[in-house]
Amino acid sequence: MLYGSKQAAALWFNLLNSFLLKLGFQASPMDACFYRRACVVDGIPNAARSDAIIILHVDDMRVAAPPEILQVIHDQLFAEFQITTSDTGRFLGMDVDYDINAGVLKMHMTTYIDSTVQRFTSFDLSRGITYRELVGSLLWIVLCVLGTELLRVKDLAKRCNSYTIEDYNDALKVLDRIVSLKHYGIIFRRGGANKEFIPSKTRLGGGLENTDEYIYSIGDQGHANELEENNLYKLTEIDDATLDIVKVLADTNTRFTKVAYSDASFAVGETKQSITGFIVMINGVPILWGSLKQTIVVDSTCSAEYVAASVCCKQIMQTENMVQFLDFTCPQPYRMYTDSQACLKIATNASKLGMVRHLEIRYHLVRCIVLSGNVTLEYCITEDMLADLFTKIVTSAQDKRLTIRFYNDCVMD
């Protein structure tokens, strides 16, 4: 059914969606493939608690629920569709390791990276140049886990329509770099006890060496990022890791430390369009990251940073809406860091708006959100700007420092 016509995928989604709605699930307004079902207490649905969460990816499904509820959902799906079950250790190339005693869940792509190396380092002329396949594999890696290499892979993707053997060799160099990082990953800790780096607002001691000192803030509770697992392998049975996630979802007192970084690289390339970089983190764990070319040409670094901050605010609100859909309690605002004093003053002081009045209405979103209290805009020095990884190729020392901070010192054993 899935591979018959252009409409097959849409027909399949409509069929499965209508079935899940009949089971009492509610689809997220932000992501049509993300479902939750309210917990029923004494015959009355309690919207503040979830008894099951489902995430879809085409014909793959990941279900999080207590064992007895999971079995009921399994039987209902089995009666309607032909389904198979698999373990939760891998899904769509991502490995998930969980230590129930330590309360630590790690996501990495070591296995997928090894298979990618095996596929593309042995060049086969009979297959032709597989540049697009290689770039596609690299994109999947940097979008799922190894976000620090996004800018390099993005540059490779620009050459897909007109590539040469030199471009293929460049892609292999990026693959080599990713191999050196394959033991890094994203880590979630029970209770939200991830270390969160607090960037410096001024240079300490007048030198960069002191900016390597870590200042950490420990969050109270929360695992918002398990919900980022929107990649699945078939209908998976409940395990201790998933059950722990459900327990966290049921805690209405869950709180988070919420941080974002916004940066811009001014007037890049022949088009002179600036590059926006952003990263959104909860409890010190990266949730969203991206590198985008701005659609307009601005006349100053200040304007470029202001536009980037607005883009970052959109990502913050997307994350916040998803958290609210799951009925988490997280009243504190996001702290968004920028390394532009001018951008900071414009977004918080109406008397400085003259510098950006020429920008379209949508780019003033950052000011509206800051004034609403949902985001507090703060300054940090450039050396501590994590979003620098998504706007430009930084120095070797800074790249190493920011990479460690991005992955929160998470190295796979």
Please describe what each predicted stretch is.
Residues 1-76, 126-151, 263-277, 301-321:
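Conserved pre-motif C helix in the palm subdomain of viral-like polymerases
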Residues 5, 58-60, 67, 94, ...:
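Residues immediately flanking
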Residues 14, 38-46, 108-122, 274-290:
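Reverse-transcriptase-like RNA-dependent polymerase core
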Residues 23-43, 176-249:
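Charged, flexible boundary elements
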Residues 75-86:
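A common structural junction motif
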Residues 88-197, 209-222, 228, 381, ...:
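C-terminal reverse transcriptase regions that engage the nucleic-acid substrate
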Residues 159-162, 256-257, 295-413:
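RNase H-like nuclease module associated with reverse transcription
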Residues 204-219, 233-302:
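RNase H-like nuclease fold core
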